[in-house]
From Swiss-Prot:
The active site is at 67 (proton acceptor), 137 (for ring-opening step), 139 (proton acceptor), 144 (for ring-opening step). It comes from Staphylococcus saprophyticus subsp. saprophyticus (strain ATCC 15305 / DSM 20229 / NCIMB 8711 / NCTC 7292 / S-41). CDD domains: GlcN6P_deaminase. Keywords: Carbohydrate metabolism, Hydrolase. InterPro entries: Glc/Gal-6P_isomerase, Glucosamine6P_isomerase, Glucosamine6P_isomerase_CS, NagB/RpiA_transferase-like. Belongs to the glucosamine/galactosamine-6-phosphate isomerase family. NagB subfamily. This is Glucosamine-6-phosphate deaminase.
């Protein structure tokens, strides 16, 4: 694992967009593990620019999103289905919809949905590149502190800190979903390559804990020490202090 400070969030986002584009252009049936949230906005913005400029054929690219809120249907403006459509799939509308996979947080039977999604990843994966953000409490996906390191796709009860952090996207904190469907930690580790991004001073503490080089269930992202091919890119504000 290597933590690299690329100075600004813009440059780091552009770098990761280039890495995704390179993977897609070199292997036209690439499988990508995608993330959402504020950290990824510029990654997708730059990726769309690269795709448009080069008119890349993405009809065989397959994607698997990390998570989705429980209780929001795909059309809800704050669902991660809507996020991905607005940030990427509608901006470059040449992906094959049947190859774009996001957990169904509004499924009638959520336990069956977690099993279905895990089985789908096992059948079609592993993904070539999994991109990740990190929460202030060290969560990746929606795997909160204390998550079993062997967890598969599962239903998560979100912590108060995560609910509070996500409340900026909703009219008020009461409207923020309290649960999510998330890839598990063991699911994430199946990827061939993992790229994690962290921007801003609020993420520094989590990155410093990640830099301690040991697996700690209280900081879920530390499970990445068990993976042989992890890259972490930060800006100046999130860079660990010496």
């Amino acid at each position: 694992m290597k933590i690299t400070n690329l100075g600004t969030s813009g440059y780091a986002s552009f770098y990761v967009a280039c890495e995704l584009y390179k993977q897609m252009s070199q292997q036209n049936h690439s499988k990508l593990g995608l993330a959402t949230g504020g950290t990824m906005v510029d990654v997708y913005r730059f990726l769309v620019q690269l795709l448009r400029k080069n008119k890349l054929d993405v009809s065989e690219i397959e994607t698997f999103n990390l998570d989705e809120y429980v209780g929001l249907d795909a059309q809800h403006e704050q669902s991660y289905h809507s996020y991905m459509n607005e940030m990427l799939f509608k901006q470059y509308p040449y992906f094959n919809p049947s190859l774009l996979h996001i957990p169904n947080g509004d499924a009638d039977n959520l336990n069956d949905e977690t099993k279905r999604y895990e089985q789908l990843i096992n059948q079609k994966g592993p993904v070539d590149i999994q991109i990740l953000g990190i929460g202030e409490n060290g969560h990746i996906g929606f795997n909160e502190p204390g998550t079993d390191i062997n967890s598969a796709t599962h239903i998560v009860d979100l912590t108060e800190s995560t609910i509070s952090a996500n409340s900026r996207y909703f009219d008020n904190e009461v409207d923020v979903p309290k649960q999510a469907v998330s890839m598990g930690l063991s699911t994430i580790l199946k990827a061939h390559r993992i790229i994690l991004l962290a921007f801003g001073e609020k993420k520094r503490a989590a990155i410093e804990k990640l830099a301690e080089n040991e697996v700690n269930s209280d900081v879920p992202a530390t499970i990445l020490h068990a993976h042989p091919n992890v890259e972490i890119y930060v800006d100046d504000e999130a860079a660990p202090r010496l």
